[in-house]
Amino acid sequence: MRLETTRNFLFASAAVLAFASPAFALDGADVLKKMNAAYHVQGAEITAKSVATNGDNVTLSGVVIGSGMDPAQQFPIGNVTLEGVEEDNGGYTIEKMSFENVNYAKEKVAITIDDLYMTGVVVPADATANTVDAMLFYDEAHTGPASVKIDGKEAFSIAESNATMTKSEDGGTLSFDLTAEGFKGDLSGVTDPKSKEAIDALQLKSLSGDLTVNGSWEVAPGTINVDEYSIDVENVGRLDMSFSISGYTMAFIKSMQDAVKAQEANPNKEQADQAFGLAMLGLMQQLTFNNAKISFDDAGITKRGIDYAAKEQGTTSQQLSQMIKGMAPMMIAQLNIPELQNAVSAAVNTYVDDPKNFTISAAPAKPVPFPMIMGAAMGAPNTIPSVLGVTVTANQ
């Protein structure tokens, strides 16, 4: 009796598992399909030689990412491991997506990237929906040391990079951050004598610095605020940029993607490029300029630049500085912008005498539609500074 009961229990358990397994089994092929759909909207494509599923983990083997069928645009990235994959209303969430170290070589160029991964990845159920939920998101994308070698010599490297994305609770705003720490550039391999002379004089043979980007995107009005886009190069200076535009909505993005697809699908390249240009011109009509700013904080490059230019012209640095200060008002006068002429001249004089920082800002009293800017550029270029509220300052 006990044996019969045990046997019935085992049969019942097996039946339950048999019926339950398909409902809970993870479909690795569908995960890849949904990921590919999200990338395809952006003009990219992912292929894998095989897909293996083990519990809530998926392994994609022989992965290649690229655009179209052109072999030149295909980039093999090896195996990709997806950990903690869960189905979510037709889409998927992935705790961590890990990539093999990149070791790519073609002709004279070799690229290596270590410690690549993404966390908090959200794969949309329907990448064609015209909502923010149709986009592929991640909490963090990370790379470790990366290097580019040309003819066996390292030309560029980065110690580490991190990119993060954060969605507000109501889904109305997306914030983003990007840092690339410890990048290095080696220009010692330049062979052209004149260029090599300039690089040596400007002390640019070896460059090192950091890149920082952060901002936000308000989805409904399509307002992109890039609060900081800075490149800080040691012994050269720090370039800071920021801007804000509106109109970059989901509808705008879809129209832009459709234009790109149409361009790629047209075999007549000249005709495709012309149609794409007209499409972009039309889309620009939907954008609005809010503000922008660009500034440079000097760390020695200005003086070295003046010294080198003076030597090339057979004069002294002091004489060249005076020439620059004298020429600035005349050059600005040719643009017929009297309200900006004095400000530019004063800023140039101040900066050349004591290079600290130089800033150009555009802050109109109210947002300016791009068509108005384009109209001013074609009809009355000298009115653009007043239309955009341009100011120029130095050492402030």
Language model features with spans:
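Gram-negative bacterial Sec-dependent N-terminal signal peptides
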Residues: 1-25, 362
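Glycine-rich, small/hydroxylated-residue low-complexity segments
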Residues: 26-396
